[in-house]
A protein has these predicted regions:
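A short loop-to-beta-strand scaffold at the N-terminal edge of the catalytic core in hydrolase folds
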Residues: 90-95
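Glutamine-centric residue-chemistry signal
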Residues: 29, 109, 135-138, 309
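Conserved AdoMet/S-adenosylmethionine-binding subsite of the radical SAM
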Residues: 143-152, 157-317, 322
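Short linear Ser/Thr-Pro motifs
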Residues: 73, 107-108, 121, 191, ...
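Conserved alpha-helical substructure of the radical SAM core
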Residues: 122-152
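Canonical Radical SAM [4Fe-4S] cluster-binding loop centered on the CxxxCxxC motif
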Residues: 97-134
Length: 344
């Protein structure tokens, strides 16, 4: 049976290669062709002997993801790709171009089951989990377009990473592998809706990644409206899990807070949020919502955003307001895929 050779560690590749009678060092050569040179044709892997290349054609699967669409913002700061996988599934990935290097935002599932009211990816529910190789392929798709260093990885595209736990962990270990991209795990951020037992499990993995939790509200009433899946875990329990993660890993947790006019962006909401987290060492990433024609939700005024931020900082909380990158190219989760499908 043919084996898909994309998305495997060097030890896994060595085991497969040697089990079929080839020298162990050929695995490293093959891995270099795949991940350092991004070559998908066995015929072009000329360091491998001819008989091995012919054997690979018969016994290995190597399918290159297809970029179906890509668009870059007017200011050049954001590029979004729509990538077609081998089974025809479409996933989005975004590259944010910073002065210190590129930050790649990847999807971990096709579709999403979380039901966030502001997200287009969840409209049709969850289709399937992505494999570690399929997540990795999104990162490498940008290698075709940009010859620039990748500084950081953000698991913040379509899907809930912690419900695809094993493949997401495999991806993190692959992308941080010195033989692949060698991204420091400290430059990897995993964003979750707050699945409490999985946060505790992640804390035990010994991977000091940054944890970002989609909080989006100061209480359960508002949070359940914005994020229906949050009904499974009380907001106080989510915050407590974040605190345990910090104590176990030493990594400060980021709370993502999307600001929606007349929903969760008032002075009272800010004060309640401060009471919720108490003296916890954390960071707030404030995100004025991306308004679209498909949802009747709008960002607060810039003045109200600053007031919200100032209240948090008055209580000693570290905050940032996310740069509005990619608005005009529909860079919010799921929007490029939706537009592509509407045109078909």
């Amino acid at each position: 049976m043919a084996w898909n050779i994309w998305g495997h560690s060097l030890p896994e590749m060595e085991t497969w290669i040697t089990s079929h009678g080839f020298p162990k060092f050929r695995a490293k050569q093959l891995q270099d062709y795949l991940y350092r040179r991004y070559i998908f044709s066995f015929d072009e892997m000329t360091l491998l002997p001819g008989p091995m290349r012919e054997w690979l054609k018969e016994n290995a699967i190597l399918e290159k993801p297809v970029i179906m669409s890509h668009i870059t913002s007017n200011d050049g700061d954001t590029t979004k790709l729509l990538v077609k996988l081998s089974d025809g599934s479409l996933v989005e990935t975004v590259c944010m171009h910073h002065v210190y290097g590129n930050s790649i935002c990847v999807s971990t599932q096709v579709g999403c089951a979380m039901g966030c009211i502001f997200c287009a990816s969840t409209r049709n529910g969850l289709e399937r989990n992505l494999t570690a190789g399929e997540i990795l392929a999104q990162v490498y798709a940008f290698r075709e377009l940009f010859d620039a260093p990748i500084h950081s990885i953000v698991l913040m595209g379509a899907g809930e990473p912690l419900t695809n736990y094993e493949e997401v962990l495999r991806f993190i270990r692959l992308v941080s592998d010195p033989g692949l991209l060698n991204i420091s795990v400290r430059n990897i951020t995993l964003s979750t809706c707050g699945i409490v037992p999985m946060i505790d499990r992640l804390a035990e993995e010994g991977l000091p990644i940054t944890l970002a939790i989609s909080l989006h509200a100061p209480n359960d009433t508002i949070r359940n409206r914005i994020l229906p899946s949050s009904r499974h875990f009380k907001i106080e329990d989510v915050v407590a899990a974040a605190h345990r993660y910090f104590k176990k890993t030493g990594r400060r947790v980021t709370f993502e807070y999307i600001l929606i006019k007349d929903v969760n962006a008032s002075r009272e909401n800010a004060e309640e949020l401060c009471r919720l987290v108490g003296k916890m060492n954390c960071h707030f990433n404030l995100i004025p919502i991306n308004g679209t024609e498909h949802i009747q939700l709008f960002p607060p005024s810039w003045k109200d955003v600053k007031i919200f931020q100032e209240i948090l900082e008055k209580h000693g909380k570290s905050t940032t307001v996310r740069r509005q990158m990619g608005d005009e190219i529909q860079a919010a989760c799921g929007q490029l895929k939706r537009r592509y499908l509407e045109k078909k």
